[in-house]
Amino acid sequence: MHFIDEVKIYIKGGNGGNGCISFHREKFVDRGGPDGGDGGFGGSVIFRSNHHINTLVNYRYQQHFIAENGGNGKGSNRSGKSGKSLILDVPIGTQIFSEDGNILLHDFTEDEKSFEIIKGGCGGLGNSHFKTSVNQAPRKRTEGEIAQEMWIHLRLKLLSDVGLVGLPNAGKSTFLSVVTAAKPKIADYPFTTLVPNLGVVYINDEEFVIADIPGLIAGAHQGHGLGDKFLKHIERCNVLIHLIDGSSHNVIADYDTVRFELESYSDYLKNKIEIICINKCDVLTDEEIQKKIKKLQRVTNKVVHPISTYTNLGVNKIVKLALEIIKNQI
């Protein structure tokens, strides 16, 4: 399935049905009074969060959604049938924005929550409403209300507790596959991960969700590479696990590149708690590991953890640390 995280769609509520002009007809009743019924209400447009959906792909090819119109009123004071509301399911984490993209209309952060974005039009009045002492046979009725219409943007921000960040080929997908049951594509070349991958980590009856974001490169916040498109998916997370390729000749430059992109993208990412890990320590000597750790700690003033997703060195420690941070922030 394609991963689609942003779409623009047109939505419109159902128009109200028209009121009816009708007069009572009955044998031996010469002049029956007005009995025109009211028009039915138009259907509303309602968005609903659904945990079974994880992409907006259903809105990529169909972009126009219109609720059902209300039925017209009928004689014998019969009201028109109300139009059926249109319910549009979206993934948890979906945000609804105005057409210009500047106004947030709703943010779905929980499952099975509904948001009525457009109310259906009211039905028109039948002629029975317009009978007066001087007008016993009114030929007047009102038309149904025209419902609101609009273009909106749907933007999906995945809900995860932990975000995996790092340059391409830092070992993020392997880390995800080791600590969860997720099966991301893994290979020894950059940009193996083309879309975000989610996995659930289970530890002693506790769990959290971790997201593997496609690798960042210099200029990602300006649209270079793949990272810019997906950085939004880790804005909601509690903690970042920053993986650095231990076999790199310049771990400082690698770290700084990713940090600059995070800080340039938003203050949300800039201020996230960060767990720094030097990965692929299985290909380094103990002396090389310590040398690189000291370099990074001197620059970052943070603890740096040596790990290997190949041998599982230090991986469980990182997972437990992430869980502890998450629990402290709840």
From Swiss-Prot:
Domain annotation Obg: ranges: 1-159
> Annotated Gene Ontology MF terms?
GTP binding; GTPase activity; magnesium ion binding
Q: What is its EC number?
A: 3.6.5.-
A Pfam cross-reference name: GTP1_OBG
What's the main place this protein lives?
cytoplasm
Gene Ontology cellular component annotations, sorted alphabetically: cytoplasm
Task: Please indicate which superkingdom the organism of origin belongs to.
Answer: Bacteria
User: Which residues does the UniProt record annotate as the domain OBG-type G?
Assistant: 160-327
Give the GO biological process terms. ribosome biogenesis
Q: What cofactors does this protein use?
A: Mg(2+)
- Give the SUPFAM superfamilies listed for this entry: Obg GTP-binding protein N-terminal domain, P-loop containing nucleoside triphosphate hydrolases
User: Where found, per UniProt?
Assistant: Cytoplasm
Among Gene3D superfamilies, the record links this protein to: GTP1/OBG domain, P-loop containing nucleotide triphosphate hydrolases
Positions with a binding annotation for GTP: 166-173, 191-195, 212-215, 279-282, 308-310
* Keyword tags: Cytoplasm, GTP-binding, Hydrolase, Magnesium, Metal-binding, Nucleotide-binding
Give binding positions for Mg(2+). 173, 193
Protein family membership? Belongs to the TRAFAC class OBG-HflX-like GTPase superfamily. OBG GTPase family.
Task of the protein: An essential GTPase which binds GTP, GDP and possibly (p)ppGpp with moderate affinity, with high nucleotide exchange rates and a fairly low GTP hydrolysis rate. Plays a role in control of the cell cycle, stress response, ribosome biogenesis and in those bacteria that undergo differentiation, in morphogenesis control.
Give the multimer and partner information. Monomer.
Which HAMAP family does this one have? GTPase_Obg
The protein in question is named: GTPase Obg
According to its UniProt entry, this protein's organism is Rickettsia typhi (strain ATCC VR-144 / Wilmington)
- Gene symbol here is obg
